[in-house]
């Protein structure tokens, strides 16, 4: 019987130049181990330049924060209804209720 080839689902690895350890150490040394700070600011700036076309970039700490920001940007507010899949985690509907809107669960 031949041995099966292992398929890695996570491609996390150190880059060729190994700068990851430098950035992690820098974050701890400067006490910026939070979802903001100079490294995040630099990432946002670099990504804006990469995307171009006068697009703005915001790095967020969680998917829930991203949904919340997207709903704000769409103008969702009190009295609105927002469709949400019913087979989901509560974090999908919480940003809707934060804004005073009503989640409507659908399949």
Predicted regions and their residues:
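PLP-dependent aminotransferase-like
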Residues: 72, 76-107
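Conserved PLP-binding active-site segment in aminotransferase class I/II-type PLP enzymes
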Residues: 1-73, 77, 99
